[in-house]
Amino acid sequence: MDYLSNNSASYFQNPSQTGKITVEGVFYNPAGTAFLEDGKYFNVNMQNSMIQESMTLNGKKMASNRYAGAPSFNYVQKKGSNSIFANASVVAGGATLKYDEGVAGINLAAETFDNMTRGLLGAKVTRNQFSGQNRYYQLMFGGAHQLTDKLSIGGGLKYVHAMRKLNGHASFGYNPFVGARVGLKGNELYLDSRRRADGVGAVLGLDYKATDTLNFAVKYETPVKLKFKTKATESTDMTLAGRKIGLSDFYPKYANGVNSRRDLPGVLSLGVSKDINDWTVSGGYIHYFNKAANMDGIDYRDGHEVNFGVDYRFSPKWTWHAGYNYAHTGAPKQSYNDTEYAIDAQIYTTGLTFKPTENHEWKFGVGYVKYNSENGEPEITHGIKLDKSKVKYDKEVGVFSLGYTYKF
């Protein structure tokens, strides 16, 4: 599952954002922007993440430790009963990953080659270096309108540009005499691949201010159809039983000339917030309609997130925040591989908001994402068995976010 719900600094203060009326609501609660104070707002955010993604096979941990920065921008113009808005952000994907000590799939391939000869081949990996990145950029424009003093509607159109990159080098050493007996020749594999796609979608929302202290909101994002086109450079001097072997045999969607669908699913978000004196409590639910989307031909289950949080205004200029989010991705084990593994996670957040004047607001947030490590399941790729049930997939992320809003 590719979507990112963390679109601003406010998310890493308190991930329960859908039920709130804020400038960042351009992304979380677009209908709620119709209830902002009149004015023009410009909001900018930067999420700074330290990300470790790892695969452990036979006690050896292969990890990528990388920094990722994700900016986002929101603009709102509110006057009377109407607002217009825009959002530019990284809406899906993640960091650039570099596995300098290799990936599990290549080591599993060496094991398979060795098992073909009951260990006589002596196959071993002599080079195993991979890097890759998935990033989806969004531009969204829309508006909102107050139907009554309690109810508003909002909506917009969005454009998504998606990129998925993979670069890999692998070399194998083995006994050439035994290799010749089983038809194995050559040593080197190389792949440099780019997948790109563009798509459009829509966003619809409702906001209901039941009272001055109680607010409900709903948002629906339509699916975004993305047909990826792959351009790749690949070289190999390896053959098995007369058939050429390439890295694209292990990562078929990254083979040159392959066109494949990997859509962003429809998303339904529900939220509520309640002010109690100097406190605000909030809760939310997000549902990802993965089953209805075409996602590289893999049968994903629907995913969901549940979140809640609190905000405490302990002075006229300062507010403290904290929150929690649980994410069930819906990704089946068969989808886990060297290029991605969408495992379930829990997010813990806290932060501060500083508003020195009516025109300036600063937000600081920190978060820790704890993932539920899982093993994969065996698969057969072009007659080569890869026992991914032996691989433990894991992630760990720490985040510091900074946001600033200026009201004209």
Regions found by a protein language model. Give the residues of each.
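Short sequence motifs at beta-strands and strand-loop junctions characteristic
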Residues: K20-G25, M62-A68, S131-Y136, D192-V200, ...
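Hydrophobic alpha-helical hairpins/lids featuring a short glycine-rich hinge
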Residues: P71-Q146, K150-S152
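Aromatic- and glycine-enriched pocket-lining scaffold segments that form the walls
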Residues: G142-Q146, K150-K209, N215-P223
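Outer membrane beta-barrel transmembrane domains
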Residues: V203-F408
